[in-house]
């Protein structure tokens, strides 16, 4: 999924802003208090509409990103000598390019199609008037997933990751080798749009991967894909090892100035 453009109205410090996004990469630059974080939070809330439509996901803060009381624009009131929220509700409108895909289990081939969809959020509940195209897109993914065994195909789910600077210090030391009781979809999207990082869940998954694979509960190669994604995102990493004894990832890193890692 690629967001083509986003319109933000009456949200935090923005009364009206329009952003057209590059399909490959976007860098947000600006002085403090100019709205860099506001734009990122608006994208989180926009994508929260997708998570809300996923019936496979449980409820709770880890699986949602909705408007908060602090998101409303406030103006100074001379009569009350303080800031009060304006009457207009926040509104976030999105145009996105979505890839609908299915994996054919008999041929091991992936077939995809691309279409543009539109939706907007004005409250913490989706409606057909505001998000019908998104609701149909998610319903198609879920139906294909639900009928995977019968039809011999499976769905491709979009990847979401919201990563802010404060997330680096959240939950890092919380890794425990505990038994996972969440569904595959729940583990995939947990904390995707949250301020916290589900480090424990990721570590538990990689720690138990071989055992789960042997029991038929995992797909072959997903552990390598996970580690390759980390190395692709951080080019300095040359090698990753899983230290299950000490509950740690260990990595071999080569800095630009060094000849060897």
Where are each of the predicted segments found?
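P-loop NTPase switch/coupling surface
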Residues: 1-201, 215-243
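Accessory N-terminal region flanking or inserted into the helicase ATPase core
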Residues: 222-226, 250-261
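Short Gly/Ser/Thr- and Asp/Glu-enriched loop/turn motifs at secondary-structure junctions
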Residues: 244-248
């Amino acid at each position: 999924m690629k967001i083509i453009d986003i319109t933000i109205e009456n949200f935090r410090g923005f009364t009206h802003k329009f952003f057209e996004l590059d399909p490959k990469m976007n860098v947000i630059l600006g002085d403090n208090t100019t709205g860099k974080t506001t734009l990122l939070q608006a994208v989180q809330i926009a994508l929260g509409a997708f998570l809300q439509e996923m019936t496979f996901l449980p409820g709770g803060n880890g699986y949602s990103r909705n408007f908060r009381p602090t998101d409303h624009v406030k103006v100074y009131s001379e009569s009350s000598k303080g800031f009060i929220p304006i009457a207009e509700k926040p509104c976030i409108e999105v145009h996105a390019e979505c890839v609908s895909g299915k994996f054919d289990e008999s041929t091991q081939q992936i077939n995809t199609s691309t279409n543009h969809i539109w939706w907007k959020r004005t409250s913490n509940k989706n409606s057909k008037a505001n998000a019908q195209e998104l609701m149909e897109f998610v319903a198609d993914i879920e139906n294909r997933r639900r009928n995977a065994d019968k039809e011999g195909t499976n769905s491709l789910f979009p990847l979401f990751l919201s990563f802010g600077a404060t997330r680096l210090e959240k939950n890092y030391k919380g890794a425990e080798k505990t038994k996972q009781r969440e569904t595959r979809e729940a583990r995939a999207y947990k904390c995707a749009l949250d301020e916290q990082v589900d480090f424990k869940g990721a570590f538990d998954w990689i720690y138990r991967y071989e055992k789960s694979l042997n029991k038929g509960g995992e797909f072959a190669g997903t552990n390598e894909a996970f580690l390759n994604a980390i190395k692709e995102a951080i080019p300095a990493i040359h090698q990753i090892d899983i230290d299950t004894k000490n509950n740690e990832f260990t990595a071999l890193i080569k800095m630009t100035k060094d000849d060897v890692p």
